[in-house]
């Protein structure tokens, strides 16, 4: 989840738009628009041991994991869900984004936990599985700095992103 500190790139104008999962608090410096609902899935490389057989919470927790987290975080919501079952996973790598997590999982025995729809194309050729424990659904949002609200080109771009996400969801 993106924290208040993550609005720096938008505020500085280094980026115009960002998509991602946001927490319950967002900076007043960031405008958001819901793009779609999503759910977390586990992802491993083809041929990984988890690609065979039933995936229990115990098997999932026993693997080596890559965590997507922002600064100063070394656990995520998955760790809370596992702890409720008396389980703990081993996080061997922490990265700042889902693309990096999937790249690591594709070339190793690491397990990535990522949003299903948000990473659909990035997971091609990998083995994806439903998580063996209850995780709340999440919302993927579009974010931008308020100074861009009235910019016609930026409004057009935001509209294109919203339309593309809606079309992709309606197709499957």
For the regions a language model picked out, list residue spans one by one.
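Short beta-strand->loop
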Residues: 31-41, 111-119, 124-139
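Short acidic active-site motifs
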Residues: 5-6, 31, 99-100
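Central regulatory/effector-binding core of bacterial HTH transcription factors
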Residues: 1-26, 95
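Hydrophobic residues within well-ordered alpha-helices
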Residues: 8-11, 60, 103-107, 142
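Secondary-structure junction motif
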Residues: 21, 28, 50-52, 57, ...
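A late-sequence structural motif
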Residues: 52, 116, 127-171
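Short loop/turn segments at beta->alpha junctions
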Residues: 2, 56, 96-97, 115
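A ligand-binding cleft/hinge motif common to bilobed small-molecule-binding domains
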Residues: 19-28, 98-127
């Amino acid at each position: 989840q993106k924290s208040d500190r993550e609005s720096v790139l938008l505020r500085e104008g280094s980026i115009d738009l960002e998509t991602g999962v946001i927490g319950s608090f967002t900076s007043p410096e960031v405008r958001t628009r819901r793009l779609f609902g999503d759910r977390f899935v586990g992802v491993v490389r083809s041929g990984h041991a988890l690609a065979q057989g039933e995936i229990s919470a115990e098997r999932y927790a026993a693997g080596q994991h890559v965590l997507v987290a922002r600064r100063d975080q070394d656990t995520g919501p998955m760790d809370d869900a596992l702890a409720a079952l008396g389980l703990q996973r081993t996080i061997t790598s922490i990265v700042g984004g889902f693309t990096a997590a999937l790249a690591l999982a594709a070339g190793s025995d690491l397990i990535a936990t990522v949003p299903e729809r948000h990473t659909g194309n990035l997971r091609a050729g990998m083995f994806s599985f439903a998580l063996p424990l209850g995780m709340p659904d999440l919302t993927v949002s579009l974010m931008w700095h308020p100074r861009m609200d009235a910019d016609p080109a930026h409004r057009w771009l935001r509209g294109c992103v919203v339309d593309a996400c809606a079309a992709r969801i309606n197709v499957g």
